[in-house]
């Protein structure tokens, strides 16, 4: 199903936004075997993901996500990329807490560790935060407290289609960047 896209990537050619959107849509709809997903993700990583590919991937993600509604404006999201390879502490979560304490409105987006030592969800869970709160609770926290945690599996349920392959690859892929640029429509 992704053969044409894989061929382009292996030829060091960038996929167009429409091509990438189609590829990600098929992946997230569960239409593509994991081996094929892995081959394309690794090929894109080796070539270097392009802006056009990230644009297409963000479009696909936004079409399939659960949005968060808020009355707040000027939101900050400190979503990290995960997988820094150096086993550093989770600075994006610490940044979210400090920024909110300083008065910023923060919609912290994140997940459990996939390719890093700790994910935001791991850190917050250890601190006693209910990371899998309903969307209405997340929205109320943001509106009333000025900070919330947007747990990726609840806002991006289709990502479960690529979770196993991402873990098996054990290296960051374009999905690590989508959290930063394709946030929960807050």
Say what each PLM segment does.
Residues 112-113, 129, 154-157, 182:
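Short acidic/polar capping segments at secondary-structure boundaries
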Residues 80-85, 110-116, 155:
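Acidic, glycine-rich active-site loops and adjacent beta-strand->loop/helix elements
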Residues 41, 89-145:
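A glycine-rich phosphate/pyrophosphate-binding beta-strand-loop-alpha-helix module
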Residues 111-113, 137-139, 160-166, 171-178:
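A generic local secondary-structure boundary/capping motif
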């Amino acid at each position: 199903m992704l053969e044409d896209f894989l061929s382009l990537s292996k030829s060091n050619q960038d996929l167009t936004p429409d091509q990438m959107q189609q590829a990600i849509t098929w992946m997230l709809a569960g239409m593509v075997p994991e081996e094929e997903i892995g081959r394309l993700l690794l090929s894109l990583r080796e070539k270097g993901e392009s802006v056009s590919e990230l644009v297409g991937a963000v479009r696909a993600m936004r079409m399939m996500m659960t949005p968060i509604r808020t009355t707040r404006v000027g939101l900050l999201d400190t979503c990290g990329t995960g997988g820094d390879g150096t086993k550093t502490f989770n600075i994006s979560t610490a940044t979210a807490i400090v920024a909110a304490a300083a008065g910023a409105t923060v919609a912290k987006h994140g997940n459990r560790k996939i390719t890093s030592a700790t994910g935001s969800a791991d850190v917050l869970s250890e601190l006693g935060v209910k990371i899998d709160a309903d969307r209405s609770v997340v929205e109320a926290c943001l509106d009333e407290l000025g900070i919330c945690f947007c747990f990726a599996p609840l806002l991006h349920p289709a990502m479960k289609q690529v979770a196993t392959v991402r873990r098996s690859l054990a290296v960051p892929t374009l999905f690590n960047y989508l959290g930063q640029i394709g946030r929960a429509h807050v």
